[in-house]
Amino acid sequence: MSRFFATNYNYDETSSSSEEDLLSSSEELLSSSEEGELSDDSLFNDESESESDFDSDDSDAKPYGPDWFKKPEFRKGGNKFLKGASYSDSDESDEEDGKKVVKSAREKLLDEMQAVYDKIETAEMSDDWMTILNEFDSITRLLVRAQQQNFGIPKIFVKVVAQVEDLVSNSEQTEIKNKAVSKAFNTTKQRVKKIARENEALLAKFREDPQSFDKEDTVEPELPPLNEENKVFTGKGVNLSSLASASSEFSFMASLQIVNDSRGKKNSNQAELIKTLEELLNIAKTPYERILAYLTLIPTRLEESTNLSYQPIDQWKSTHDDLNKLFDILDENISSYQVTELAARNDDLETEPEPNANGIREILGSLLSFTERLDDEFKKSLLNIDPHSSDYLERLRDEQNMYNLLLRTQLYMEATIPEERQEQLLARAFVRRLDHIYYKSNKLISIIENSAWKAVPSSYKSKYIPFSGNADEEYCSQLVEGLSKSLANQDNVFLQKRATLSHIYYTALNGEFEVAKELLLKTKVQSNINKSDPSLQILFNRVVVQLGLSAFKLCKIEECHQILNELLASSHLREILGQQSLQRIASNSSSSSSSEDREKQCLPYHQHINLDLVDLVFMTSSLLIEIPQMTAYLTGIKTKKVPVYQKSVRRLVESFDKSFFHGPPESIKEHVLYAAKSMQKGDWKGCLEYLKSVKTWNLLPNSVEVLDNLTERIQIETMKTYVFTYRRFYEKISIKKFSELFSLPEDKIVTTMEKVIADLELNIKLDDNKTYIVIEKGDEVSKLEEVAVKLNKEIRATRERLNPSHHNHR
């Protein structure tokens, strides 16, 4: 049975669990009332529930129906005959007077869930899937509230999941004609599938016997037998809530041992364990006792949220604070006690470990594992919170606290671990630290580093990446390079590749394109990347995109186009960059895939690369490369035919030319298209204006500088397009006129035209003084002749179609 079904009160096995036994045996009723009232109608599996109150109108009514003796009215009426019952006529009169009943938070939550159940039942009659979806989302949020308040999983929630699951399975989408309702149906189907998978055991139990699901008895969890010292706690089980309060007569270590033995048990109550450990911390006398208490409390807090999608934020902060308090104790007693993974196991908690040669008592524990788990829970929360809400920004503020803890853990390990084992054991801390900074600019890294070093004790120093007091640009570069090199020396291939890719990403992001490119080619990390872990493949794809953006910032258009071309040809760009939502992955993945595997396939929203910016950069590069080449090819110049890609500008232009009605540009794609049409006309100013009007450029940190560099390239490519298009109308063109028309220096025009003539073997040359472009007439067909030939072919085809017999006779 799941631990959510555990109760905290003692249960007498002699008392009957069925309602019919209540009717037949007054002795059992008496024994039941003496042992403690047992609620069969409890909707929660982990707590007992008192009988619900009823209005006087209902209580006066006569019970009816075949199971009338099971009605609450019958049981309430019978209570006044029990020993010790406080039922009286005055109670009835109080209820008749209409006194307000104050409900607990749990009862209010149950009422809200019951209201959801009723609304879904009503919506079922009219197939109102939009209401069903809204109410299902509501009860999902209520479940989170219930679990955050340690109420467990209410049975009414299981009922609603089963109810919606049955509705989905009994309905067919083909019968739904309304598009909005059909969309709501699909969304409901996906969400209920995911939640049903997470609560599979409870649903199976409900479907096995729905009627007795609410009335199932709960059993007190079995605890290990107590020794002679523990005989202060007698009876059928140990009440953990009174454990710490009895510590004046019951030793701290014995209490801690009982808590440790209770952890991981089937019916153990995590909330009570945490409360007990917090009370034990208040009475702990020695540093050794406080260290042991924290080493038990921290993992217990983490275990409490095992079945949740992420640890609730208030619990996460409590765990974070506990870990910092543990570090405070360890820092104060660093010469006496140290927590390390290299210590020997000590089965006897009451006996402190023997001091080593340096007089230090080593306690077995992994502080880094606690920090890693907190970091995982932090990432999970970011993946599950709506990235467009204020909650996400609020949660993101905790990243600084998380990074402070990572740095503190690393520095403590450097101070306590033998030098020969440091680099191996610190690798996990290095990769976590690198994961938090590799995608940030130097300015952001400087802020987070300065804040982190201020938060850790000043006595700590790092020999791997020394901190001089100010995280300037040079320090940030040395930090990423130092962490990457240290990880590259590890035997673990995964860590080696991840460190290398993170280093390349950081280098490209901060404007060093050539260095990043050489590093990628030198390490050959791209070989066999398809066989690597999914998270590595995602990081590699991110590196490729960042390299393309870095090349574009430096106006290396050809290299940018070449780098991004293959990646943007994919129809699943969001997926291969790890930028799809966790919920979408869960709905599309098979039931066999674990939540950990799904989390590897996506990144928190603040780490995403803006796909609109990537599209804009690629299409702009495509515009500058393809429009001149396409114009040259279509005007009869012998040149290599431009291949057509999915997002190439040539495809957009061809589609645009086939349409008749053209509105003003709205999307990024349309702005680039209109810029291409302006370039074809030789209007470089219009081309630049259309590109500059796209607001997505503001996402580049140096957007003004990038657009200024782009201006000259647009002028040159527009000039080349103009020459290819209109050369048949000229015998010679003045360089000075071109300089005025395209706002380019004359020497730049001469250099460009010399290169074009050499590459394409045009019948064009410069005069001796290089003041004119002389165009030699060749055999090329003029535009008018092209239209005439085309029209002649169409006339002939039409004539043959209208007079087939005349054509055959001839």
From Swiss-Prot:
GO BP annotation list: formation of cytoplasmic translation initiation complex
Polar residues: bias regions: 1-11
Xref: Pfam families: eIF-3c_N, PCI
Annotated Acidic residues bias: 34-58
Disordered: annotated segments: 1-98
Signal peptide stretch: none
SMART domains attached to this UniProt entry: PINT
One GO MF term attached to the UniProt entry: translation initiation factor activity
Record's GO cellular component terms: cytoplasmic stress granule; eukaryotic 43S preinitiation complex; eukaryotic 48S preinitiation complex; eukaryotic translation initiation factor 3 complex; multi-eIF complex
Subcellular localization, as worded in the UniProt entry: Cytoplasm
Keywords, ordered alphabetically: Cytoplasm, Initiation factor, Protein biosynthesis
Record-annotated PCI domain positions: 605-780
InterPro entries reported in the protein's UniProt record: EIF3C (IPR027516), EIF3C_N_dom (IPR008905), PCI_dom (IPR000717)
Low complexity compositional bias, start-end: 12-33
Annotated family: Belongs to the eIF-3 subunit C family.
Oligomeric and partner information: Component of the eukaryotic translation initiation factor 3 (eIF-3) complex.
Function: Component of the eukaryotic translation initiation factor 3 (eIF-3) complex, which is involved in protein synthesis of a specialized repertoire of mRNAs and, together with other initiation factors, stimulates binding of mRNA and methionyl-tRNAi to the 40S ribosome. The eIF-3 complex specifically targets and initiates translation of a subset of mRNAs involved in cell proliferation.
Name this protein carries in UniProt: Eukaryotic translation initiation factor 3 subunit C
Organism: Candida glabrata (strain ATCC 2001 / BCRC 20586 / JCM 3761 / NBRC 0622 / NRRL Y-65 / CBS 138)
